[in-house]
C-alpha cells in the first residue's frame, strides 16, 4: 500500500486543483509553484535525496518508521487548509515524505525478494502505484461533485490508509542485507579500513556509468510521464476534442490498464524472459503511442486516442519505471544502494519540475504538436538507452551481481 498512498497523493492534488484554485483564487504563478514543489516534482526530489542517505546510514526501517508520520502531517495541512500557505506547506511536506518513502520501500522490496522472483516482488510496488491513482480518480469523479469538501475527503482517505500502513510497519524487521553490510562496515571502522561514501563515489567509474544509464532510462522517460500525469486531461479535451467526462474515463482507463499490465506482464514475465526483449517491446509501443499526438488535430480519430491510452497504460505499468526500480536496486551495492536511488530520483524529479514549467510555454509559443515531437524524442531516447544497455541480471542474487560488476564485494 506504500505506492498506493504515494501515487494517490499526486493524483488527488491534480484532480482537485481547479477546486482549490476557485476557493483560494490562486494566480498562475501560485499554481505553477504548487505543481513544481509538489510530491510529483521538487519536494519529492529533496525527500528522496535526504531519505536515501538516511536509509543507508541508519537503516531502511528507520525511514519506514518516520516518513509516513511526515506524510500524515502534510496531508492534515491540506485537508484542513484555509489559505495558500497551508496548502503549499502541505504539498511540500507530503512530497518530502513521498520521496523518502519511495526510496526506502523500493530498496527494501528488492533486498528481501528471492533472486528468481525479484521482478515479481518489485512489480508489486508498481501495481499499487497504478491502483492508487485509479481509485483516487474514481473517488474524485464522485466526490468532486460536492465541491472542495469532496477533494478534502479524498485526501483524508489517504491519511487513514497511511496511518494503518505506518502501524503495520512497526512490526517489520530491518533489511537483512543492510544489517549485514552495516555490521561489516562497523568492523572495518574499528580496523581503520573503511572508506566513506560520498556523492563523488556515485559520480565516478562504474557508478557514474550506471547513474547515466538509469537517468537515460528513467529520467528522460519521466519527462513524458509527467506530461501525461499533469496535462493529459487538458490535452484530451483541447487537442483530442473529447468531453470532460470522456477525458476522465480515458485517464481512469489508463491506470486500470497500467496495474493489469504490471500484474500480467512485468510480474509474470520479468523473471522468466529476456528483460532486454521485454523492455524493447514495452518501450517501443510507448514511442508509437506518443507519435499519435504529432499528427494534425483533424487527423486524430477515436481509435487512435484509445490506442494511445492502451499503449501508454501498458508502458506505465510494465515499462521504464518498473525496470528503473528493479535495476536501480540490482546495479548498486547495499552500502550505498538507497543513496544512489535517492540521487537518480532527485535528478528525475528536478528535471520533471523544470519540464513542467516549460510545457505550457512551449504549447503557447509553438503549439502542442511541437511539444509532442519533443516527447516522442524523449520516449525514443529512453527506449534505445534501455534496450541497448539492459543488464543481464535475471535470476542472480544481489551479491552475485555486485561481484560481477565490481569484481569484489563492496565494503
Please annotate each region the language model reported.
Residues 59, 80-85, 114, 296-299:
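Helix-breaking motifs and short loop linkers at transmembrane-helix boundaries and internal kinks
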Residues 14-46:
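Extracellular/periplasmic helix-loop-helix junction of adjacent transmembrane segments
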Residues 62-76, 277-292:
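Structural signature of the two symmetry-related core transmembrane helices
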Residues 90-127:
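Cytoplasmic helix-loop-helix junction between adjacent transmembrane helices
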Residues 46-82:
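Conserved MFS/SLC helix-loop-helix module at the cytosolic interface between two early adjacent transmembrane helices
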Residues 48-59, 261-274:
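Helix-to-loop junctions at the C-terminal end of transmembrane segments
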Residues 119-144, 161, 345-355:
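Glycine-rich segments within core transmembrane alpha-helices of 12-TM secondary carriers
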Residues 13-14, 207-259:
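Extracytoplasmic gate region of multi-pass secondary transporters
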Amino acid at each position: 500500500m506504500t505506492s498506493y498512498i504515494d501515487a494517490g497523493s499526486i493524483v488527488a492534488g491534480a484532480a482537485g486543483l481547479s477546486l482549490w484554485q476557485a476557493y483560494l483564487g490562486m494566480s498562475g504563478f501560485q499554481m505553477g509553484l504548487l505543481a513544481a514543489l509538489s510530491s510529483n516534482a521538487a519536494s519529492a526530489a529533496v525527500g528522496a535525496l535526504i531519505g536515501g542517505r538516511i536509509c543507508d546510514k541508519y537503516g531502511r526501517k528507520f525511514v519506514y518508521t518516520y516518513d509516513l508520520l511526515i506524510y500524515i502531517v502534510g496531508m492534515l495541512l491540506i485537508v484542513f487548509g484555509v489559505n495558500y500557505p497551508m496548502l503549499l506547506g502541505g504539498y511540500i511536506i507530503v512530497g518530502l515524505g513521498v520521496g523518502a518513502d519511495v526510496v526506502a520501500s523500493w530498496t527494501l522490496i528488492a533486498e528481501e525478494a528471492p533472486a528468481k522472483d525479484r521482478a515479481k516482488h518489485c512489480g508489486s510496488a508498481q501495481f499499487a502505484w497504478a491502483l492508487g491513482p485509479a481509485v483516487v480518480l474514481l473517488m474524485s469523479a464522485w466526490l468532486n461533485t460536492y465541491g472542495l469538501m469532496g477533494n478534502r475527503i479524498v485526501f483524508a482517505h489517504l491519511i487513514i490508509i497511511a496511518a494503518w500502513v505506518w502501524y503495520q510497519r512497526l512490526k517489520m524487521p530491518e533489511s537483512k542485507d543492510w544489517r549485514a553490510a552495516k555490521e561489516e562496515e562497523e568492523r572495518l571502522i574499528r580496523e581503520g579500513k573503511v572508506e566513506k561514501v560520498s556523492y563523488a563515489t556515485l559520480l565516478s567509474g562504474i557508478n557514474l556509468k550506471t547513474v547515466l544509464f538509469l537517468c537515460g532510462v528513467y529520467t528522460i522517460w519521466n519527462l513524458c510521464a509527467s506530461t501525461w500525469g499533469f496535462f493529459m486531461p487538458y490535452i484530451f479535451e483541447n487537442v483530442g476534442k473529447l468531453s470532460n467526462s470522456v477525458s476522465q474515463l480515458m485517464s481512469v482507463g489508463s491506470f486500470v490498464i497500467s496495474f493489469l499490465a504490471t500484474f500480467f506482464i512485468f510480474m509474470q514475465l520479468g523473471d522468466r524472459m529476456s528483460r532486454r526483449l521485454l523492455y524493447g517491446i514495452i518501450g517501443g509501443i510507448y514511442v508509437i503511442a506518443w507519435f499519435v499526438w504529432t499528427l494534425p488535430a483533424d487527423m486524430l480519430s477515436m481509435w487512435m486516442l484509445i490506442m494511445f491510452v492502451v499503449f501508454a497504460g501498458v508502458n506505465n505499468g510494465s515499462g521504464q519505471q518498473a525496470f528503473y526500480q528493479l535495476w536501480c536496486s540490482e546495479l548498486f551495492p547495499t552500502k550505498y544502494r538507497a543513496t544512489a536511488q535517492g540521487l537518480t530520483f532527485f535528478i528525475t524529479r528536478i528535471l520533471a519540475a523544470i519540464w513542467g514549467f516549460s510545457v505550457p510555454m512551449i504549447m503557447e509559443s509553438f503549439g502542442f504538436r511541437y511539444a509532442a515531437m519533443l516527447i516522442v524524442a524523449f520516449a525514443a531516447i529512453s527506449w534505445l538507452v534501455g534496450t541497448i544497455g539492459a543488464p543481464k541480471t535475471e535470476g542472480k542474487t544481489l551479491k552475485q551481481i555486485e561481484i560481477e560488476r565490481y569484481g569484489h564485494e563492496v565494503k
